[in-house]
Amino acid sequence: MVSIRLPDGSIRQYEHPVTVAEVAASIGPGLAKAALGGKLDGELVDTSALIDRDASLAIVTDKDADGLDIIRHSTAHLLAYAVKELHPDAQVTIGPVIDNGFYYDFSYHRPFTPEDLEAIEKRMQELAKRDEPVTRRVVSRDEAVSYFRSIGEKYKAEIIESIPASDEIKLYSHGGFTDLCRGPHVPSTGKLKVFKLMKVAGAYWRGDSKNEQLQRIYGTAWTKKEDQDAYLHMLEEAEKRDHRKLGKQLDLFHIQEEAPGMVFWHPKGWTLWQRVEQYMRRRLDAAGYLEIKTPMIMDRSLWEASGHWQNYRENMFTTESEKRDYAIKPMNCPGHVQVFKHGLRSYRDLPLRYAEFGSCHRNEASGALHGLMRVRGFVQDDAHIFCTEDQINSEAIAFNKLAMSVYEDFGFDRIDIKLSLRPEQRMGSDETWDHAEEGLRNALKACGLEWEELPGEGAFYGPKIEYHIKDALGRSWQCGTLQLDMMLPERLGAEYVAEDNSRRRPVMLHRAIVGSMERFLGILIEHHAGAMPAWLAPFHAVVLNIAESQAEYAQTVVQSLQKQGLRVSADLRNEKISYKIREHTLEKVPYLLVVGDKEREAQTVAVRARGGVDLGVMPVEAFVERLREDIQAFK
């Protein structure tokens, strides 16, 4: 007798061992048809999995997130099947699920073309319509190696050879195609209805640039066509909002080959940068932070003491001078500890909050660089709080409130918060970890925030809160961090005099709100599609004259506005006014002020807001009042 507990708490009993598919069929024909897999005692399994013991079971359908993963995984195998049918000489390697889809890497003697992708996708559709059953068999490692070598799949054989000899190997087959996989997979290819191949990119075998170069075909798969259509529309919108394209269009920045991963900021882009930095500086000052500046290049001995030299050296830029080794700092924390150590600290000095817009450099792989989002040289809104264990909760509460307020001001109102908890290998006592984790939990609770807990995901030296902001397209970006550190103060010898005159180590809270300034500006540009709120925009307004006779008045308007602290320029070119309006509209300037003879005589301006909204004619001071209302909240 096998007893199976279902998600609603009910128990079904069977005389003999049953498969997941048979359990689904016993519940109802609709569920049997919809079943993609099962969750057996928390583990994802195929519908063909045999249950021969008492267990809990949830039937997985396309309404579940796990169901979508199964569909995407199976579609990756369908892709490999289609490629092998059309290009028998291609060698298959790996094909995992990724966010919003999947990819599969192939070794082939020539590049896949867009026409190839069309043909492959068409063949995938044909194979799916055949509704071929997907079967699983378990074999020994040696048997699997022998099989893949016999059909010329050397990459698959190499993967299997790296698996312990005692492990069982799962092979999945549909039609004439067999692949190595942990599974689970859909019961038949007919379940794969909505998919699209997206692009081809380069990759390396096992991710190592020293190995053979492969071709990676990316695809997306969904349960419903409308979901895929929405995703494809989002990608189209994302392409329009690409910060690299807008950076060029709006003349904000550029990156060139002579300085890979380093940004050349143009005047408008640097104005945007300054608006963000000055805003952050005001917020930090009001929150009790002390701004400092630490050296960019420091001796190897400091990086050895901090542990970076041993654990992070391959990501650091190093240099040598007068027989001494130096590193360009990849992060600011060791320097902040040096400032804390410079002088005797008392418990009365704590909490001590040091902030720095610190310039850091990391030797990122050239293939990973991506506009402002992944660079080698960047500035962080970095700060470190030195406090006692008893102050963790209050400092975390203050930081949560500050971070959420900042995100709101920048236009982000959807924030996902994740709390990473103690890993198995860690420093410090369980009591210390209990205190630290509970302090962060209570801080989130006190701020009325919801969060997801990630057991085992914390660093070995302390728990961490991550702040993931969602942009206008629903994409998630991890920006803010609050990392509790019980290690670095000890490694670098930071201490304070406690109330009983003993020497104690402070707790160190690493924290950032925007993170990398470059990356945050890239996110901002894409979130607002380049149309920055007036308080952030490089220019608040541009004054346009209709004819040369109004040029002097236009200049007078500009000077008047500039004297009041507004960022305004004039376009006095001898061009048609429609041409000038179109040009500055494309530059996404918040306000265009048009002046003709009537406006000059009446000492007024005709105001056009972004988006072509005609606000009518008004005195200059009335416009100033309107603009100040627009930006006042962030001054």
Swiss-Prot record:
Its cofactor is Zn(2+). Residues 242-533 are annotated as: Catalytic. SUPFAM superfamilies: Class II aaRS ABD-related, Class II aaRS and biotin synthetases, TGS-like, ThrRS/AlaRS common domain. Keywords: Aminoacyl-tRNA synthetase, ATP-binding, Cytoplasm, Ligase, Metal-binding, Nucleotide-binding, Protein biosynthesis, RNA-binding, tRNA-binding, Zinc. It catalyses: tRNA(Thr) + L-threonine + ATP = L-threonyl-tRNA(Thr) + AMP + diphosphate + H(+). Zn(2+) binds at C333, H384, H510. Gene3D superfamilies: 3.10.20.30, 3.30.54.20, Anticodon-binding domain, Bira Bifunctional Protein, Domain 2, Threonyl-trna Synthetase, Chain A, domain 2. Belongs to the class-II aminoacyl-tRNA synthetase family. This is Threonine--tRNA ligase. It comes from Burkholderia thailandensis (strain ATCC 700388 / DSM 13276 / CCUG 48851 / CIP 106301 / E264). The lineage of its organism: Bacteria, Pseudomonadati, Pseudomonadota, Betaproteobacteria, Burkholderiales.
